[in-house]
Amino acid sequence: MGRNREDDITPLQQETLDEICRYVSAKGYPPTVKEMSETFGISHASVHDRINQLVRKGYLKREEGKARGLTVTKHPQTNAVALVAVPIVGTVAAGHPIFAHENITGEVLVEASVVGSGKCFALYTQGDSMIDAGINDGDLIIVRRQPIAEDGDIVIALLDDEATVKRLKIDNELIELVPENPRLKPIRVKPEDELRILGKVVGRKRI
């Protein structure tokens, strides 16, 4: 059975959808109507019209009252879910551990294949302790919430109420939080320490 022609999008609507996808891929969040108006050299009303048609046809989802409230829900070539919104919940130290307050400060759009079926959150990193794992100062890391992790996983760990991102090393009774920077030493978890795994790092975005 062929696709319903009501779901077909025009070249101008395709151009708009492609620009939203490009913008999200580059910056991690969708453009505003004003930004798209400037990009295409058209009026705000024309941008709204394109967005309304894409929402009606199921290619976009719009959250009312937000300037950056667009989410791409499918692509005409794949007809597959493309992006999901993940909450940003603060800053985690990637050097010296600091307390991370789980206050939601915003959202970032992430490929659905990265998130999978789990619940995720995002955090900005500070410091250079994980540079050899490709995690640099200021990166936004995507974390899948899970209370346990395996040896070798990069995790967000809460150690005595201080959060840090490190590689988890488990060797019999020995547990260490290992930096990916040869200049820094591992943090050995002592029996009296309170260690809690907040989640596993599954991706990152360089904003």
From Swiss-Prot:
Signal sequence, renumbered to the chain: none
Record InterPro entries: LexA, LexA-like, LexA/Signal_pep-like_sf, LexA_DNA-bd_dom, LexA_repressor, Peptidase_S24_LexA, Peptidase_S24_S26A/B/C, Tscrpt_reg_HTH_AsnC-type_CS
The entry's DNA-binding region: 33-52
Disulfide bonds: none
UniProt catalytic activity: Hydrolysis of Ala-|-Gly bond in repressor LexA
Domain of life of the source: Bacteria
Pfam families membership: LexA_DNA_bind, Peptidase_S24
Residue numbers annotated as active site: S129, K166
GO molecular function: DNA binding; serine-type endopeptidase activity
Keywords: Autocatalytic cleavage, DNA damage, DNA repair, DNA replication, DNA-binding, Hydrolase, Repressor, SOS response, Transcription, Transcription regulation
EC number from the UniProt entry: 3.4.21.88
Top-level EC class: hydrolase
Family: Belongs to the peptidase S24 family.
Job of this protein: Represses a number of genes involved in the response to DNA damage (SOS response), including recA and lexA. In the presence of single-stranded DNA, RecA interacts with LexA causing an autocatalytic cleavage which disrupts the DNA-binding part of LexA, leading to derepression of the SOS regulon and eventually DNA repair.
Protein's name in the database: LexA repressor
Species in which this protein is naturally found: Oleidesulfovibrio alaskensis (strain ATCC BAA-1058 / DSM 17464 / G20)
